Design a protein with these regions (language model features):
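PLP-dependent class I/II
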Residues: 1-150
Length: 150
């Protein structure tokens, strides 16, 4: 449905759209804003960023090492300069359906790269995240996936 300003239906849409926008665009409370401002001005935000960068760098390196040790026979891990995800390209395209089925069966959730594409036809790959997981959880998941794919 396409409605223009000249359309009589336009007037009927104003109130519902205003309500939707006011619900969607609610701002943080003054106390939340003041707390965040203090968090930033007193240096806690910078400290937090440094801590998280260090943590994510450790997890990133751990993921790369473990992934390559356990799964390099099935995947080529693309290592970006930055970010919290990796793309793992299947060495054998015919394995895509099996890997997709196995990951669902064992509860590991790398997304197929195709989920992020509208029209592009890419070679089969999966997107793995690492930031939310401890090294022990990363190892456990990768071992589980490698074992299930043998």
């Amino acid at each position: 449905m396409h409605v223009t300003v000249d359309d009589p239906a336009f007037e009927q849409l104003i109130d519902p759209l205003v309500k939707i926008r006011s619900t969607m665009d609610q701002h943080s409370s003054a106390i939340d804003q003041a707390t965040l401002a203090r968090f930033i001005t007193e240096g806690f935000f910078l400290s937090h960023l440094k801590q998280m960068r260090r943590l994510y760098a450790e997890r990133r390196e751990f993921f790369i090492k473990e992934f390559n040790k356990l799964l390099s026979d099935r995947f080529i891990l693309q290592i970006p300069e930055a970010g919290l995800n990796f793309v793992a390209w299947l060495r054998c395209e015919a394995d895509f359906a099996r890997v997709a089925r196995v990951r669902a069966e064992i509860g590991i959730k790398p997304s197929p790269l195709s989920f992020y594409c509208i029209q592009a036809k890419l070679k089969p790959a999966f997107v793995f995240g690492f930031a939310a997981w401890t090294p022990a959880q990363i190892r456990e998941s990768l071992v589980k996936l490698a074992s299930a794919l043998k």
